[in-house]
A protein has these predicted regions:
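A short, N-terminal "cap"/entry segment at the start of jelly-roll beta-barrel domains
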Residues: 1-39, 101-148
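Surface-exposed interaction/gating patches
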Residues: 123-126, 130-180
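Short histidine-centered beta-strand/loop micro-motifs
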Residues: 45-46, 56-60, 77-78, 96-97, ...
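Ligand-binding loop in jelly-roll beta-barrel domains
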Residues: 28, 79, 90-115, 184, ...
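Glycine- and acidic-residue-biased ligand/ion/polar-headgroup-sensing regions
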Residues: 50-51, 60-75, 165-181
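Histidine-centered metal-chelating micro-motifs
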Residues: 53-56, 74, 86-95, 159-160, ...
Length: 217
């Protein structure tokens, strides 16, 4: 299966408008944003676990990254409520489950072999955040030569300057609204822009965004 698989082309998906599609595991559903492959695939998706559901044990050959959007995600390493950011490096193995139910933004098979450390961060911890000025705050979640991942908070009424991303940029709207080059996007919107893209962010209500850069070029 190929969905938004050409990384040299821009892609925009309003995930809130997509139907949930059943996965091979009972109680686990997906909304696919990008995919290149079948069940073992390079993929970015929203995944929803019904209360009491679980996935079978599995190994992530090329890693897994996810942000908990709702509920509580659990595995052998702990319980992670909404706001937690997790990276499981290539070769890691776990058995995901959720007692109360959960929804996550997850990226699969997108890590190089050089990545070896697990990451567990609570993005709601004030100590992670720094003020960038001009109505922007940032929490750095991961930084390496191959990519940089942050949570970005925009104040109500924010109007930013145009920025160019030489190695591409990916955004997911977690809360609020964000206008990108004049088009307003709301929670669940996902955008991927190729290298050398230029964009301007603004927000009327304020916004919380997941942003990844440097990974597309």
């Amino acid at each position: 299966m190929r969905l938004n698989a050409d990384l040299s082309r821009p892609a925009t998906v309003d995930s809130a408008a997509l139907a949930w599609v059943a996965s091979p595991m009972a109680g686990v559903e997906r909304r696919m944003l990008e995919r290149d492959g079948d069940e073992v695939a390079r993929a970015t998706s929203l995944v929803r676990y019904a209360p009491g559901s679980a996935f079978s044990p599995h190994t992530h050959g090329a890693g897994e990254e996810f942000l908990v959007l709702e509920g509580v995600f659990s595995d052998e390493t702990g319980d992670f409520p909404a706001g937690f950011y997790v990276r499981n490096p290539p070769g890691s193995r776990h058995t995901p489950a959720s007692a109360p139910g959960t929804a996550i933004l997850v990226k699969l098979r997108q890590m190089p072999p050089e990545e070896t450390a697990a990451v567990r961060l609570d993005t709601r911890d004030p100590a992670l955040w720094r003020d960038l000025g001009q109505g922007r705050q940032e929490a750095v979640l991961f930084e390496a030569p191959w990519e940089r991942v942050v949570m970005l908070r925009l104040a109500p009424g924010h109007a930013g300057a145009a920025e160019t991303w030489p190695r591409g940029v990916e955004l997911f709207v977690v809360e609020g609204d964000v206008a990108i080059d004049g088009t307003t996007h709301r929670p669940g919107a996902w955008l991927r822009l190729p290298p050398d893209s230029r964009l301007t962010l603004a927000s009327q209500e304020g916004a919380l965004l997941y942003r990844k850069t440097g990974h597309l070029g």
